[in-house]
């Protein structure tokens, strides 16, 4: 089974695809979608096109998205909600459903502490998947963590 984990962001959208087979996890690919255009409509289209490419190329079975973190800037939260809505619609069209996890759930699943720092989550991602190189930016390790969290909640196959 292939799981796509997504960490939506207003400038970078982290993604990771992991394989979950026989209770073993392995990383297939991970990266981020850089949102560089200035017009919101173009940003949404770029994001959706990139998601389409990932779904086509890697034959994803399940998708997990991290819930929006409510920061102090309402404008950023609204923009992020628009991105997340567009992602959700595309995933529903292509896959049929998706799962959502709060940052607290993801941190707790990987570190045992719902208030863990992003660096602690990145450390556990590397440890669980036997990754020796640095994972930068942290949007990528967050996306991997979302995928791992989802894999942990699935029934063994």
From Swiss-Prot:
Binds 2 Mg(2+) ion per subunit. It is found in: Cytoplasm. One of its GO terms (molecular function) is crossover junction DNA endonuclease activity. Keywords: Cytoplasm, DNA damage, DNA recombination, DNA repair, DNA-binding, Endonuclease, Hydrolase, Magnesium, Metal-binding, Nuclease. One of its GO terms (biological process) is DNA repair. The active site is at residues 7, 66, 139. It comes from the Bacteria. InterPro entries: RNaseH-like_sf (IPR012337), RNaseH_sf (IPR036397), X-over_junc_endoDNase_Mg_BS (IPR020563), X-over_junc_endoDNase_RuvC (IPR002176). Gene3D superfamilies: Ribonuclease H-like superfamily/Ribonuclease H (3.30.420.10). It catalyses: Endonucleolytic cleavage at a junction such as a reciprocal single-stranded crossover between two homologous DNA duplexes (Holliday junction). Mg(2+) 1 binds at residues 7, 139. Pfam families: RuvC. Belongs to the RuvC family. Homodimer which binds Holliday junction (HJ) DNA. The HJ becomes 2-fold symmetrical on binding to RuvC with unstacked arms; it has a different conformation from HJ DNA in complex with RuvA. In the full resolvosome a probable DNA-RuvA(4)-RuvB(12)-RuvC(2) complex forms which resolves the HJ. The RuvA-RuvB-RuvC complex processes Holliday junction (HJ) DNA during genetic recombination and DNA repair. Endonuclease that resolves HJ intermediates. Cleaves cruciform DNA by making single-stranded nicks across the HJ at symmetrical positions within the homologous arms, yielding a 5'-phosphate and a 3'-hydroxyl group; requires a central core of homology in the junction. The consensus cleavage sequence is 5'-(A/T)TT(C/G)-3'. Cleavage occurs on the 3'-side of the TT dinucleotide at the point of strand exchange. This is Crossover junction endodeoxyribonuclease RuvC. It comes from Helicobacter pylori (strain J99 / ATCC 700824).
